[in-house]
Amino acid sequence: MTIRRAAVEEASVLTTIALEAKRYWGYPEHWIKHWESDLTVSPEFVRDNHVYVAEADGEVRGFYALCVGEEKEHELDRKAELEHLWVSPDFIGTGIGKELFLDAMERAAALDVRDVELSADPNAAGFYTRMGATQIGEVDSPIDGTERKLPRLKITP
C-alpha cells in the first residue's frame, strides 16, 4: 500500500468512499442524504487542502484531508483540522485507517502544526483515542429530531 497526494480527478471516488464508510455504521439512508453535502469532496477541496489517499493494487482504499490553518506570528499557535479520514468498508479493520492517521500526523508535524483537532463520528471515537487523541468537548449534531453529540478531539502530532 502507498499513501500519496490525491488528484483533483479523484474527488468523486473520495466522496463515494466517505458515503459508503458512513453507511457502514448502519445509519438510516435519510440521515446519509442529510450528511451528503458534508461528505462530498470537491475537486477544489482536493486542490486547496492536504488530501492523501491510501492506494493498493491500483485501487483507492481510503483517504484523509488535513486542513491547515494560517501561519501565526508564533508558529506554535498553528492548528489543523482533520476534516476527513475514511476507509472503504471492505478494508475497515485492516490497518489502513491507522496508516492514514499516522501519515496525517507526520505531515502535520512537518507543517509545524501544534494541534490537530477533529469532530469524530461516535463510532470512530474509540479509534482516535487509541491513536492518542483526547476529548476536549462535544459538538451538537442534531438530526431528524434526534439529539446527537459528536466528540471533539485533539492530538498533538
Provide a role label for each language-model segment.
Residues 128:
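Conserved active-site tyrosine of GNAT-family acetyltransferases
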Residues 8-11, 15-90, 101-103, 107, ...:
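Acetyl-CoA-dependent GNAT
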Residues 1-9, 157:
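Conserved N-terminal entry element of GNAT/NAT acetyltransferase domains
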Residues 117-119, 134-152:
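Conserved catalytic-core motifs of GNAT/GCN5-like acyltransferases
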Residues 95:
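Conserved G/P- and acidic residue-centered "switch" motifs that form tight phosphate/ATP-binding loops
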